[in-house]
Amino acid sequence: MKLTKNESRMRRKIRIRKKVSGNGARPRLVVYRSNLHIYAQLVDDQTGTTLAATSTLALGKQNGNALRLTVDNASLVGKEIAKLAKEKNIERVVFDRNGYIYHGRIKAVADGAREAGLEF
């Protein structure tokens, strides 16, 4: 039986997570993409805590209007997570694409974070 897109993504995710982990000095920047929003969070895998998180949903609530899931708004999420990281004195991160192909909105989050000063 053929694997669905999501099942393939979950298998890729497991392979990636075997190799990628974050710590306090260099946390993992995890990106999740749903049909309506994109989410990004910084995770310290040694303690199992989320250090910072943001999404198009959270940014939309701050602005008072709903943000649609576009490449431009994904870039805004990247810039916002970089700003939150800078507030916590985090300069370097490990990027976890969460099984998604590094293209489009996922790439836009990474590029936005790099523009705002995060090192991958």
Swiss-Prot record:
Keyword rRNA-binding listed: yes
Signal peptide extent: none
Gene Ontology terms describing biological process: translation
Highest taxon listed in the record's lineage: Bacteria
Swiss-Prot/TrEMBL keywords: Ribonucleoprotein, Ribosomal protein, RNA-binding, rRNA-binding
Any one of the GO CC terms: cytosolic large ribosomal subunit
GO function terms (MF aspect): 5S rRNA binding; structural constituent of ribosome
Keyword RNA-binding: yes
Primary role: This is one of the proteins that bind and probably mediate the attachment of the 5S RNA into the large ribosomal subunit, where it forms part of the central protuberance.
Subunit structure: Part of the 50S ribosomal subunit; part of the 5S rRNA/L5/L18/L25 subcomplex. Contacts the 5S and 23S rRNAs.
Official protein name in the record: Large ribosomal subunit protein uL18
Natural source organism: Oleidesulfovibrio alaskensis (strain ATCC BAA-1058 / DSM 17464 / G20)
Protein encoded by which gene: rplR
